[in-house]
Swiss-Prot record:
One of its GO terms (cellular component) is cytosol. Its EC number is 6.3.4.2. This is CTP synthase. ATP binds at S14, L15, G16, K17, G18, I19, D71. Belongs to the CTP synthase family. Residues 294-537 form the Glutamine amidotransferase type-1 domain. CDD domains: CTPS_N, GATase1_CTP_Synthase. It holds the Pfam family CTP_synth_N. It is an enzyme of class 6 (ligase).
Length: 539
């Protein structure tokens, strides 16, 4: 029987529910259990694919092409699982399916209401995730905080789950905030008490409390919280601010969180103890890196940390392999000109230009890529970064001065980057990109092939609607650009590189989405190796 863990949050947002869910998932996975991660987002958008990165942050992409919340990236990297369309559900997606069923007549003329139709759909999504992944445990994070109007249907649905699948198969984990008042020099438990009271008022009794705090929570306070919340004191866990995400699962294990979970849910785990030896080595490496490598990221959304979270994480993962801390300096692409590029990039050891949409900042990207190419600074381009590297090469090596991307200038004579054929008549924006996992054939004797340890075929995740215009391939190759990765039918350019440079590689796909702390993605591994000048130092 599948077990279900629901992670909710109270008091304030951004407490780290996703990190809590991921940490529990990692511990259970390392006990030999199959874990499925899931995120419910209460916004009415169908998915975050068309949302402004400044509002929502990065859009994460799964193997099956789902555009999802960035928390799925945390799940994949921390738990080391693959997520799917069953892993991210929004209010918009729920209502869309309910209304489609109503239009088909599936409700036989009945009045469609939040209860039972919307709540039933939410429960269906939870149980479908279990069925489609054949998992032991589904861990579902409920976005927002208890008391939010938007999350009410989700709270009601997970309340009903306990009755439908049995109390022995459901566990409620509530993440709450214990503020420290510096003036009074004391922690306050009242917000936690009120948050749990609100949760109980809608029929959910939490089985475990995770207390987020910047200071250790004394035992007397835990006893007090237990008295007011009816949560056994042994099931009250503290989650202190940590210097590294690696610390969180280890802290939970020290407090016996995984054992409490398997005891409460009556799980017979294949391993009696979670094997966290490799995790501890990663934690030790991350805290004691010997070297530093400075990387410059030139992008469109640099003001928001979460906009490139998978990219910056992937850079750090590669840094661990070389025992080097990666110091990422982010520069707004619009701020880069021919006059200041030398000053801005003079101290960098590597340049990365990640993905994005729209024409803003393209000239700055092209200028920075040109400087990196001419001064042999290691360069990695991703998606839009690959497209701008192609445009830069056309302008400054092939001397096609009007070369551009059709996204920036649709009627340009030399559109090096053009709209994909199946996108030309597309009127909708959302969910219509080339999305998900696709294969690429790698050319022998290239840096790309070397990055992937000699593999002939790789599978990577994509999110784009523009592609390299094939009529220019011969001219590019004659001028020194190598097409080191292409689709199996040789139609779509996946990777370009200048082989005689220290490292000048750009990919149409998003390599950052498959990077893991203990397994850095190939292009990031090659890029940081070239930028740092270091040898691999395994931990």
């Amino acid at each position: 029987m599948t077990k279900y863990i629901f992670v909710t949050g109270g008091v304030v947002s951004s407490l780290g529910k996703g990190i809590t869910a991921s940490s529990i998932g990692r511990l259970l996975k390392n006990r030999g259990l199959k874990v499925t991660m899931q995120k419910f987002d209460p916004y009415i958008n169908i998915d975050p694919g068309t949302m402004n990165p400044y509002q929502h942050g990065e859009v994460f992409v799964t193997d099956d092409g789902t555009e999802a919340d960035l928390d799925l990236g945390h799940y994949e990297r921390l738990v080391d699982v693959r997520t799917s369309k069953y892993s991210n559900v929004t209010t918009g997606k729920i209502y869309q399916e309910v209304l489609q069923r109503e239009r088909r007549g599936d409700y036989h003329g009945g009045t469609v209401q939040v209860i039972p139709h919307v709540t039933n759909m939410i429960k269906e999504k939870v149980m479908r995730a279990a069925q489609m992944t054949d998992t032991d445990v589904v861990i579902s994070e409920i976005g927002g905080t208890v008391g939010d109007m938007e999350s009410t249907p989700f709270m009601e649905a997970i309340r009903q789950m306990r009755r439908e699948v049995g109390s022995e198969n459901v566990m409620y984990v509530h993440v709450t905030f214990v503020p420290y008042l510096r003036a009074a020099k004391e922690l306050k438990s009242k917000p936690t008490q009120q948050s749990v009271s609100m949760l109980r008022s809608i029929g959910i009794q939490p089985n475990m409390l995770v207390l987020r705090s910047e200071m250790p929570v004394p035992q007397e306070m835990k006893d007090k919280i237990s008295t007011f919340t009816d949560v056994p004191v042994d099931y009250i866990v503290e989650s202190l601010d940590a210097p590294s995400l690696f610390d969180v699962p280890l802290s939970y294990q020290e407090q016996g969180v995984d054992q409490k979970v398997v005891d409460f849910l009556h799980i017979d785990s294949p391993k009696p103890v979670a094997d966290m030896d490799e995790w501890r080595r990663m934690d030790e490496r991350a805290k004691n890196l010997k070297y530093k490598t400075k990387i410059t990221l030139v992008g469109k959304y640099v003001e928001l940390e979460d906009a490139y979270i998978s990219v910056t994480d992937a850079l750090q993962h590669a840094g661990y392999l070389y025992n080097s801390k990666i110091e990422v300096e982010k520069i707004q692409a619009e701020d880069i000109t021919e006059d200041n590029v030398a000053e801005l990039l003079k101290d960098t050891q590597g340049l990365i230009v990640p993905g994005g949409f729209g024409i803003r900042g393209l000239d700055g990207m092209i200028t920075s890529i040109k400087y990196a190419r001419e001064h042999d600074i290691p360069f990695l381009g991703i998606c839009l970064g690959m497209q701008m590297a192609s445009v830069e090469f056309a302008r400054n090596v092939l001397h096609l001065e009007d070369a551009n991307s059709a996204e920036a200038e649709p009627n340009c004579k030399n559109n090096i980057i053009d709209l994909m054929a199946d996108q030309r008549d597309q009127e909708k924006i959302g969910g219509t990109l080339r999305l998900g996992l696709y294969p690429a054939m790698l050319k022998a004797g290239t840096k790309t092939r070397e990055c992937y340890d000699g593999q002939e075929v790789i599978q990577e995740r994509h999110r784009h609607r523009y592609e390299f215009y094939n009529k220019y391939r011969e001219d590019f190759e004659k001028a020194g650009m190598t097409f080191s990765g292409v689709s199996p039918d040789n139609h779509l350019v996946e990777i370009v590189e200048i082989t005689d440079k220290k490292f000048f590689v750009a990919a149409q796909y998003h390599p950052e989405f498959l990077s893991r702390p203990n397994r850095p993605e190939g292009l990031f591994k090659g890029f940081i190796g070239a930028a740092s000048g270091l040898q691999v130092d395994k931990f």
